[in-house]
């Protein structure tokens, strides 16, 4: 197992490129199950979760392999069972449920695992699929689903669930009749999935709004598709520029998907602008804290909450962070406190007293975004920080040390 050793206090300057989106790649790769022809995905990040998904697709009958930055998938003899050995490591594996039911009329998917940052129940997925004619039972830790043919339905989500919207979006493409999804998630990754499905012959309208209409088609064909850039990686690099008092040009930055993040950075005193070649984020001599409340898109993303808390620790003044999406998403707080941060928790709210000089310390990552927060804190801290359990980080960031070192970071990966 590896750890990152970071010597902080160096402003980051230069150009850094954003990889393809993990959260767009996972459902789009799962959508391969719906196709009856080969497909090529470009701009796919080389991450642990992507490699796990490729292995899972192979077991399900869709052999997938990297060729350069592209993943080639060849759907062939489909298998309805997603085994526990792979599913236990990644919650997104439940996204194969809808496509399997749509193609085979059956699915046997182990109950999902992944980051321990909240319940993230799959009941929203199951109850919606039941309205389309599926039946489910839990058998020895597996979700077992069956149907003759999925039927179009009018479905309203109690909460704009991203995974639920994606699962139903995929299932409905091959269903009989029209499916309407109300209170659907509006995230850019949902739009990317819908755009991919349309490129394969699906009939979908309304993506990006809270009402999506899908008219089922007989089949979906293959295509070549480029995955959108990763808005959370881009946001993390934007915070890195601020927390190190640096100046970064971020290439392939999906600006339109980061309005809430960019505005909060401006509120804190950073220069953020679009220019030829990317998005510029520059420290302007002062950082002032702010308040953050996480919301579904287009609100402030929960996946950027931990990174902003690290930034608020070194900014002047007091700030509040309220987490409304997931419970248990403040596990990075105790590690930041070990580095000298002043953060107090009350329920789902964190009160951050800024203006602190963080100091290097051994810290332990508890989930993907918490690990990013600790890396950012290490970049700003005096002395040396050791971030342990970085397998969480590798699930969502493509060789982060190889991207940060060329812009001035002193960060290296070593065995524990």
From Swiss-Prot:
Residue numbers binding phosphoenolpyruvate: 22-23
Domain of life where this protein originates: Bacteria
Subcellular localization(s) per the UniProt record: Cytoplasm
CDD domains in alphabetical order: UdpNAET
Enzyme Commission number, as recorded: 2.5.1.7
UniProt modified residues of type 2-(S-cysteinyl)pyruvic acid O-phosphothioketal: 115
Record keywords: Cell cycle, Cell division, Cell shape, Cell wall biogenesis/degradation, Cytoplasm, Peptidoglycan synthesis, Pyruvate, Transferase
Transport keyword on record: no
Example GO biological process: UDP-N-acetylgalactosamine biosynthetic process
MF term (GO), any: UDP-N-acetylglucosamine 1-carboxyvinyltransferase activity
Pathway: Cell wall biogenesis; peptidoglycan biosynthesis
One Pfam family cited in the UniProt record for this chain: EPSP_synthase
Record: residues binding UDP-N-acetyl-alpha-D-glucosamine: 91, 120-124, 303, 325
Reaction catalysis annotation: phosphoenolpyruvate + UDP-N-acetyl-alpha-D-glucosamine = UDP-N-acetyl-3-O-(1-carboxyvinyl)-alpha-D-glucosamine + phosphate
Function: Cell wall formation. Adds enolpyruvyl to UDP-N-acetylglucosamine.
Similarity comment text for this entry: Belongs to the EPSP synthase family. MurA subfamily.
Protein name per the record: UDP-N-acetylglucosamine 1-carboxyvinyltransferase
């Amino acid at each position: 197992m590896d750890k990152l050793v970071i010597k902080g206090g160096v402003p980051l300057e230069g150009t850094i490129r954003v990889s393809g989106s993990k959260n767009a790649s996972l459902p789009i790769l799962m959508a391969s199950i719906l196709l009856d022809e080969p497909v090529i995905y470009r701009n796919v990040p080389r991450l642990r979760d992507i490699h796990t998904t490729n292995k899972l697709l192979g077991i399900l009958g869709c052999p997938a392999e990297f060729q350069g930055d592209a993943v080639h998938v060849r759907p062939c003899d489909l298998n309805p069972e997603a085994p526990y050995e792979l599913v236990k490591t990644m919650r997104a594996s439940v996204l194969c449920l809808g496509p399997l039911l749509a193609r085979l009329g059956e699915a046997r998917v182990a109950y999902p695992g992944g980051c321990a940052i909240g319940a993230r129940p799959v009941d929203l997925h199951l109850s919606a699929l039941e309205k389309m004619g599926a039946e489910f039972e839990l058998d020895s830790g597996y979700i077992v689903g069956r149907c003759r043919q999925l039927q179009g339905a009018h479905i309203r989500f109690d909460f704009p669930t991203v995974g639920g919207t994606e699962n139903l979006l995929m299932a409905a493409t091959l269903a009989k009749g029209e499916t309407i999804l109300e209170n659907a998630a509006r995230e850019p990754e949902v739009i990317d999935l819908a755009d991919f499905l349309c490129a394969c012959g699906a009939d979908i309208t309304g993506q990006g709004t809270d009402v999506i209409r899908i008219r089922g088609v007989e089949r979906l064909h293959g295509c070549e598709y480029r995955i959108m850039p990763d808005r959370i990686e881009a946001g993390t690099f934007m915070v890195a520029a601020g927390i190190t008092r640096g100046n970064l040009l971020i290439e392939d930055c999906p600006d339109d998907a980061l309005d809430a993040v960019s505005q909060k950075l401006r509120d804190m005193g950073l220069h953020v602008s679009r220019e030829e070649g990317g998005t510029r984020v520059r420290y302007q001599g002062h950082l002032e804290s702010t308040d953050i409340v996480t919301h579904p898109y287009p609100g402030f993303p929960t996946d950027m909450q931990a990174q902003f808390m690290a930034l608020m620790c070194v900014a002047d003044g007091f700030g509040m962070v309220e987490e409304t999406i997931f419970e248990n998403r403040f596990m990075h707080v105790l590690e930041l406190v070990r580095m000298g941060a002043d953060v107090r928790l009350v329920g789902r709210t964190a009160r951050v007293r800024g203006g602190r000089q963080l100091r290097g310390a051994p810290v332990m990552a508890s989930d993907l975004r918490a690990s990013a927060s600790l890396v950012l804190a290490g970049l700003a801290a005096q002395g040396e920080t050791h971030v342990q359990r970085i397998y969480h980080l590798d699930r969502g960031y493509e060789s982060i040390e190889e991207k940060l070192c060329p812009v001035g970071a002193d960060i290296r990966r070593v065995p524990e």
